[in-house]
Amino acid sequence: MNKDNNISIYRARKLIKNVLTQVIDNPKNPDFLNFFHADTYRFYFLMSFMWEYLEGNEISQEYAISLVPKKYASRIKRLQVLKQAVRLNYISETSSKVDKRRRIYKPTENLLNDFFTYTDNIYINSKAV
């Protein structure tokens, strides 16, 4: 291995350790992470959903289930995850003011607070990576 490979290996090991300790094996992680880390689709959905919310976009049911490519989950699975997140009080569901049949989704205050704690911890602990 040459010098560049040693640097790459060092960075790769730091990244892997950071992901394992901060994302997967961290006992301080909020409860919502257990739900959203259960499979690839849920984690992808969480990140996409939070991105859209933080960008200020209104998130309808159809928009929410379209955030993640279809190859990760069927339409039924996508709807089930959204509805389960609502039942678990991670995401709130309200009727649109314009069209009462249309449902609008937002993260709950608890999810927002826990998500920001989670991202702050990862950011602080990964600055050295």
Language-model segments: residues:
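An acidic intrinsically disordered interaction segment
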Residues: 1-19
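Short, amphipathic alpha-helical interaction segments positioned at domain boundaries
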Residues: 110-129
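Short amphipathic alpha-helical interaction segments
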Residues: 71-87
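A short, conserved structural fragment
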Residues: 86-96
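Alpha-helix N-cap/helix-initiation sites
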Residues: 35-42, 57-58, 75, 79
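Short acidic, hydrophobic short linear motifs in intrinsically disordered regions
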Residues: 55-68
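Short alpha-helical segments that sit at the start of domains
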Residues: 18-49
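Short, Lys/Arg-rich nucleic-acid/phosphate-binding segment
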Residues: 95-104
